[in-house]
C-alpha cells in the first residue's frame, strides 16, 4: 500500500489543494496524510498565546480570521452547492463551539 503525506505548504492554497486532489485521485489503494494548511499551526499558536496573555479579544479576532480562511477554501474548492453548504455549516459549527468555549474562558477569568 502506498502512503502519501502532504505538508502544510502542499495544501496551503486552493491551487495546491486541487493539485494534491489530482495526485491522489488514481484508483490504487493508498493512505493519504494531510498536514494543516499553511499558516494554520501558526494561527493556532498565536491564538494560544493570546489566551495565555488573557487577551480574549485578540484571540477572538484570530479565530474569526481562521474561520473565514476555511470558509474561503470551501467556497473555492467545492462545486456542488449542497456539499459546499454542508462543509460551510460544519466549519461554522466547529468555530462557534470554539468561540463558545472562549466565552467561558473569558467569563471564568474575570
Regions from the PLM with identified roles:
Residues 1-110:
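Nucleotide/pyrophosphate-binding catalytic subdomain
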